Swiss-Prot record:
Pfam family for this entry, one: ProQ
Region (Disordered): 106-154
Any one GO molecular function term: RNA strand annealing activity
UniProt superkingdom: Bacteria
Matching InterPro entries: ProQ, ProQ/FinO, ProQ/FinO_sf, ProQ_C
Keywords carried by this UniProt record: Chaperone, Cytoplasm, RNA-binding
Membership in a protein family: Belongs to the ProQ family.
Biased composition (Basic and acidic residues): 106-127
UniProt entry tagged with the keyword Acyltransferase: no
Gene3D superfamilies, per the entry: ProQ/FinO domain (1.10.1710.10)
Job description of the protein: RNA chaperone with significant RNA binding, RNA strand exchange and RNA duplexing activities.
Protein name per UniProt: RNA chaperone ProQ
């Protein structure tokens, strides 16, 4: 059983009638001018066809005859054809001029529309470029400047300042570190650093 579902749009209608009447309707290349009154012939031939209605046929035929392919085919020397491709007389000058004017008008509309679309695209691109230029780039935060520690001025201890329990500074090469004297043995002095570490240093390395 054949599928009797109706065709969805004019494009499908044109493809269908081109399949049914290939000598009349052409899908590729220059189309042939159609017989005047061909709609009635088409409606009669397809009156019992459940896939297409008269309204669909009229819309499909209108789209087919307004295409650039069809209008190009309406020219001097061309003959109209019926559904079976049989010649039905040459075109009249009036119809040729009308087709020519319609084609030129259609092409002009397309050219104008494309020009407007191109202009709109340029304006949108320009607007985006302007928006990007107006937005300042995000600045990266500058690293905080390292605080330069000023060296603490110290002096050598006097002999009477080298006593057990006295808080002193000891020169450790990388700088002076706080310490406490815990034992004295002539020039050797045992000290305890702030971290609890004990060590023996020369008295001359102790500072106040």
């Amino acid at each position: 059983m054949e599928n009797s579902e109706k065709l969805a749009n004019s494009k499908e209608v044109i493809a269908y009638i081109a399949e049914r009447f290939p000598k009349c309707f052409i899908l590729e290349g220059e189309a042939k001018p159609l017989k005047i009154g061909i709609f009635q012939d088409l409606a009669e031939r397809l009156s019992d066809d459940p896939k297409v209605s008269k309204t669909q046929l009229r819309a499909g035929l209108r789209q087919y005859t307004s295409s650039w392919r069809y209008l190009h085919g309406v020219k001097p020397g061309a003959s109209r054809v019926d559904l079976d491709g049989n010649p039905c007389g040459e075109l009249e000058e009036e119809h040729i001029e009308h087709a020519k004017a319609t084609l030129e008008e259609s092409k002009a509309k397309v050219a104008t529309r494309r020009k407007e679309q191109a202009k709109k695209a340029r304006e949108e691109a320009k607007a985006k470029k302007t928006a990007r230029a107006a937005t300042p780039p995000k600045r990266r935060p500058q690293p905080a400047a390292k605080k330069v520690e000023q060296p603490v001025e110290t002096r050598a201890l006097n002999a009477d300042e080298i006593t057990v329990g006295n808080n002193v500074s000891v020169n450790m090469g990388k700088g002076n570190m706080p310490a406490t004297i815990v034992e004295i043995n002539k020039d050797d002095v045992r000290i305890r650093l702030s971290n609890g570490l004990q060590m023996v240093v020369k008295a001359e390395n102790l500072r106040s």
